[in-house]
């Protein structure tokens, strides 16, 4: 972002992945294209299986124990605080990962965890070239569940033996333990369900610990028929991934352009989860004068996602987590409520099958021993967790060349992210049925303004002393706003708006606003002697609003050396050695990303509570002025 360098002359540690490698992978988030391609870069995805979820990226391990270890993302020279998944991977020319202090020290207070530079495509001189790309794929759960018991008969036999041994251990005789264990298989303190039809006067499990050979799977309870279902098949699916991109590029010696539109629909492995992205980008560059070049790059992306809540690894104990339910539920429980003839009972409004929550509501005296009141497959149909994003990323720049080898570039970058979430907990089934349903609206807006001035000068002395000088100034201002509201007791069953709730006393709202500002001046000097010996020195003085006014400025530097032994006389005759480089670097980096949700740690924070005209303020955080 702060200039370019040849690989042979570069003294820092960096790795690059080009467009061909990125496009060769069917990934929704460009960061997944880094997986397995670079030493020292770890890419891991959340376990929830939601399409469009950005992976966790760690460059040379964890950079902070208590702070955030996320690297800094820079898109076309400007810090990018949005979701990388909003970028169309087909618009990316290259991604460069800066790993060490020599490479990242120039980024000051934000570069401690490494830097990922993303360069988007630009126009190329020549006739207009139109490219259309269409891709189809499938998403499948690759990591299967643990080897568990899937046969209902085997499960009942093991459960019987465990209970029988328990009764024997507490003093029951063999006959009593046998009878007690059989009865306990069905009650609420055992497994809660009897899914077998056994002839009158007989027990399900014999004294030999095996299933009664006269038992048949399936049992009628009044108007209901009970039989186990495959929860895996009822919860997971193979999702279709489809992507279409159209781009046009071309230009002349003085003018070039690049434009693209794209559409992506990525269905998840959990029923009801998907991610849709409509993307567009246009970039132009015009050489107005021999000494003046103007350019701009504007991208607008619209995203719509359905993301069932409670599916991440941190929610594994949640009753909404499909992975937890499917991995742990016994193979004896029904997924659906059935009529006595075995057909599905259907919802009167949607005609969808009615799901069994294991709470005894439909199947009297049958209460599931595991996760009673939960059925994630039903939640995927009747609940809503819909996210909408509109993202604008725009840059305008001008480069002047007042004298030979001196370029001065001024850039203005503007970023806007409007995100809305519509959340609905249905009023008929599940956790929110007793409340009459639940509705929530969340809205957030993130705005960023970046101003940057860079001066680059190159000079060669005596044909072997190559020097490169860079001096720059950068300011970044970010503002984020959020507003959230929720209510209970829905009027319209499918309405997610708060004004669709009838219980005014239970309506709640919350909101907030934060600002974040950085200022920095920086410079770098590169020296190259005869393409054999290299040296680089960089310095940045940075200020961050996250620290106390007395401690906001910090100094960051790096020194690096390099030697390409392949250019020495004693190795020049070895044609199979084209680069043999030894590098060493030392530097200091900063990390102002402390994971602050609302306000800096250096100020006192009071929580305002109460619903009357006068409310109390309780001290929630005691500020530390030394930060």
Predicted regions mapped to residue ranges:
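Proline-centered flexible-loop/turn and helix-kink motifs
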Residues: 34, 39, 320, 328-331, ...
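A surface-exposed, glycine/aromatic-enriched loop/edge motif typical of exported proteins
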Residues: 145, 149-211, 301-364, 477-493, ...
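Extracellular/periplasmic, surface-exposed regions of secreted and cell-surface proteins
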Residues: 21-24, 69-70, 277, 283-292, ...
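Outer-membrane beta-barrel transmembrane strand signature
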Residues: 184, 190, 195-249, 254-260, ...
């Amino acid at each position: 972002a702060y200039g370019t360098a040849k690989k042979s002359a570069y003294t820092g540690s960096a790795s690059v992945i080009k467009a061909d490698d990125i496009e060769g992978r069917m990934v929704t988030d460009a960061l997944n294209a880094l997986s397995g391609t670079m030493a020292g870069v770890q890419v891991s995805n959340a376990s929830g299986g939601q399409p469009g979820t950005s992976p966790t990226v760690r460059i040379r391990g964890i950079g902070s124990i208590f702070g955030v270890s996320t690297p800094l993302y820079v898109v076309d020279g400007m810090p990018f605080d949005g979701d990388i998944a909003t970028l169309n991977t087909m618009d990316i020319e290259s991604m460069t990962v800066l790993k060490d202090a020599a490479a990242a020290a120039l980024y000051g207070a934000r570069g401690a965890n490494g830097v990922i530079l993303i360069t988007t495509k630009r126009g190329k001189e020549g006739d207009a070239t139109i490219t259309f790309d269409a891709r189809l794929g499938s998403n499948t759960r690759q990591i299967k569940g643990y080897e568990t018991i899937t046969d209902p008969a085997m499960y009942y036999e093991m459960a019987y033996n465990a209970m029988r041994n328990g009764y024997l251990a507490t003093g029951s005789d063999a006959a009593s333990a046998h009878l007690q264990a059989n009865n306990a298989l069905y009650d609420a303190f055992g497994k809660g369900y009897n899914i077998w039809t056994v002839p009158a006067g007989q027990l399900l499990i014999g004294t030999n610990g095996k299933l009664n050979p006269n038992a048949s799977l399936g049992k009628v309870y009044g108007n209901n028929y009970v039989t186990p279902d495959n929860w895996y098949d009822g919860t997971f699916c193979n999702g279709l991934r489809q992507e279409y991109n159209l781009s046009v590029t071309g230009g002349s010696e003085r003018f070039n352009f690049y434009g693209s539109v794209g559409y992506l629909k990525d269905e998840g492995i959990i029923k009801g989860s998907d991610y849709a992205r409509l993307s567009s980008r246009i970039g132009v560059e015009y050489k107005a004068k021999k000494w003046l070049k103007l350019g701009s790059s504007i991208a607008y992306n619209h995203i719509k996602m359905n993301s069932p809540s409670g599916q991440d690894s941190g929610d594994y104990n949640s009753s909404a987590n499909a992975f937890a339910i499917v991995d742990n539920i016994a193979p004896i429980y029904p997924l659906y409520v059935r009529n006595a003839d075995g057909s599905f009972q259907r919802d009167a409004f949607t005609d969808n099958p009615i799901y069994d929550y294991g709470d005894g509501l439909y199947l009297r005296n049958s209460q599931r021993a595991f996760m009673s009141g939960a059925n994630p497959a039903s939640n995927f149909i009747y609940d809503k967790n819909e996210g909408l994003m509109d993202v604008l990323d725009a840059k305008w720049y001008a480069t002047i060349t007042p004298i030979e080898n001196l370029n001065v570039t001024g850039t203005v970058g503007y970023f806007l992210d409007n995100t809305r979430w519509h959340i609905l907990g249905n009023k008929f089934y599940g956790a929110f049925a007793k409340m009459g349903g639940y509705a929530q609206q969340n809205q957030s807006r993130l705005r960023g303004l970046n101003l940057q001035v860079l001066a680059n000068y190159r000079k060669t002395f005596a044909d072997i002393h190559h020097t490169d000088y860079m001096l720059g100034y950068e300011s970044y201002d970010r503002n984020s706003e959020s507003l959230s509201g929720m209510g209970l007791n829905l009027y319209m069953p499918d309405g997610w708006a708060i004004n669709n709730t009838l219980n005014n006393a239970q309506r709640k709202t919350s909101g907030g606003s934060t600002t974040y500002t950085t200022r920095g001046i920086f410079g770098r000097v590169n020296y190259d002697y005869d393409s054999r010996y290299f040296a680089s020195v960089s310095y940045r003085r940075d200020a961050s609003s996250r620290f106390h006014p007395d401690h906001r400025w910090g100094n960051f530097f790096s020194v690096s050396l390099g030697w390409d032994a392949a250019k020495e006389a004693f190795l020049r005759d070895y044609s199979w050695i084209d680069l043999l480089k030894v590098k060493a670097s030392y530097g200091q980096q900063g990390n102002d990303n402390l994971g602050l949700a609302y306000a800096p740690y250096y100020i006192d924070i009071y929580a305002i509570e109460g619903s009357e005209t006068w409310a109390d303020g309780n001290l929630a955080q005691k500020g530390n002025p030394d930060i």
